Amino acid sequence: MIAVVQRVDEASVSVETPAYEARIGRGLCVLLAVERGDGEAQAEWIAGKIARLRIFPDEQDKMNRSVRDIAGAVLLVSQFTLAGNCAKGNRPSFAGAAEPRIGEALYESVAQRLRTKHELCVETGVFGAKMKLSVVNNGPVTLIVQQRHKG
């Protein structure tokens, strides 16, 4: 599982058909790819990592607070292209991405864990849809968080 985590002042995602929009203020915009072989263990780990990452400043301007500490929100957007491999040729291979049925289930699992276990306000994109994403980065602070399955 791969997540690109961005500290944001605001972020939104929209889909034209069917009409859909989700928006957050201060918090994290997370682009998430589920890889072949991923399971609930990776969903649990990455949700915990997203919730606990201390990338927001404290009173001394040190990165010492999590999204939960600042009462921020998470915009979680599926992005299978993060699992793309560009090692050969010029067209990426997405063979490393989970099949859509599994990818969607684990994407939803991460969202649900963030909401229930970590008590965060979570907005989501639409799995598998072509989306437009608007992000106002803060910092910028962008991290790649990855949990590989064992085996």
Regions found by a protein language model. Give the residues of each.
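An anionic oxygen-ligand recognition environment, strongly enriched in 2H phosphoesterase
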Residues: 96
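Active-site-adjacent loop/tail segments of enzyme domains
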Residues: 100
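N-terminal, polar/charged subdomain of small-to-medium soluble alpha/beta proteins
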Residues: 1-93, 105-151
